[in-house]
Amino acid sequence: MGYFYFCDANNCPLAQGTAIKFPSLVQHEAIIDRAWNGQQVLLEKSKQHKKPRVTNSEEYRNVPFVISRVPSSPAHGLRIVQHAYAEIQAGAPWTAFDNCQDFVSRAYTGRNGSETRNFVFGALAVVGLVGMAAASSR
């Protein structure tokens, strides 16, 4: 049996360092790499598994995905996965303030970044402001 590969619109396997998202409420995000045997693997920080890890792409077979970030060159792709492997080696646990999107953002930019967390905090701020406005108008 052959390996499962995440591919682009032209059915070409995604390059090393490409980030993909699995559209859902939480927008799980992971990074593509290749194992020693050529099999595509995902580098991710998983809430379910509580820490960063390398997983077989088969785990996400038939799960819809979108390409969220693309490395600018093969060398950039290599640096991205090197940063991701360093985080996997460190093993810091998943938290709401250090999630899969932060993991990918740090691999790409060296800084945290989570669209989901930003959305939740933004929504909470709006709810708080509306609540304060409603309370002050009484």
Predicted regions located by residue number:
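Short amphipathic alpha-helical face segments that pack within enzyme cores
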Residues: 103, 125-128
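Short hydrophobic alpha-helical membrane-entry/anchor segments
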Residues: 114-120, 129-138
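Active-site nucleophile-His-acid catalytic modules used for acyl/amide transfer and hydrolysis
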Residues: 67-121
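Charge-dense, low-complexity polyampholytic segments
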Residues: 48-50, 119-124
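Amphipathic, alpha-helical segments enriched in basic
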Residues: 5-7, 59, 63, 72-75, ...
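Glycine-rich catalytic cores of cysteine/serine-nucleophile enzymes that process amide/ester linkages
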Residues: 3-68
